[in-house]
Amino acid sequence: MSRYRGPRVKIVRRLGPLPGLTTKRRKLTEQNKLQDKKQKKSQYRIRLEEKQKLRFHYGLTERQLLRYIRIARKAKGSTGQTLLQLLEMRLDNTIFRLGMAATIRAARQLVNHGHIVLNERVVDIPSYRCKPNDKITIRDRDRSRILIEKNRTARSRLRIPGHLAMKQNTALITQVVDPKSIGLKVNELFIVEYYSRQA
């Protein structure tokens, strides 16, 4: 299954705010509120929607998400918490959380086009798993600097998470992310339950 490229507001309308997918918000009207109350959701649908939230927010394919579930299952500790840590420590998500891009999709494009330097090497793999003490900088090109500065100015009110430290154009990953501090309301246990028969 390929990555979703369709209308994003349609997804936000169905699943709620997804900051990694789009900056647009759902307009709350009285009719929307009534529709939300009317719908009775099955247990399967509740779990499916939680899984879809995660998939669309991080911009993953079904196969990629299943692979992360399998890795999380093998690790020690809570599968759901480990899954969120794996996804939060991806390079494209880290760029997004630093405010260098408006969405995770835009952050992925920055990485793919070689605008990001990780530990003094250009990295063009968005799924690269960042580790504590990794240093992220902007590539020493005018185009890269202008593009990222424009994004950071637009997102100047953004609060940088506790596991990241930012000084001018250099960011440092200080520790592994705490799953409670992710920028998305999601019930990871429902996602693990959804995949319990597949993975």
Curated annotation (Swiss-Prot):
Pfam families listed in its UniProt record: Ribosomal_S4, S4
Any Gene Ontology CC annotation: small ribosomal subunit
Subunit structure: Part of the 30S ribosomal subunit. Contacts protein S5. The interaction surface between S4 and S5 is involved in control of translational fidelity.
GO terms for biological process, alphabetical: ribosomal small subunit biogenesis; translation
Subcellular localization(s) per the UniProt record: Plastid, Chloroplast
Gene Ontology terms, MF aspect: rRNA binding; structural constituent of ribosome
Organism: Zygnema circumcarinatum
Major location (coarse): plastid
InterPro entries reported for this sequence: Ribosomal_uS4, Ribosomal_uS4_bac-type, Ribosomal_uS4_CS, Ribosomal_uS4_N, S4_RNA-bd, S4_RNA-bd_sf
Name of the protein in question: Small ribosomal subunit protein uS4c
Residue ranges of domain S4 RNA-binding in the record: 89-151
UniProt cross-references to CDD domains, sorted A to Z: S4 (cd00165)
The family this protein is said to belong to: Belongs to the universal ribosomal protein uS4 family.
Keyword tags: Chloroplast, Plastid, Ribonucleoprotein, Ribosomal protein, RNA-binding, rRNA-binding
Function: One of the primary rRNA binding proteins, it binds directly to 16S rRNA where it nucleates assembly of the body of the 30S subunit.
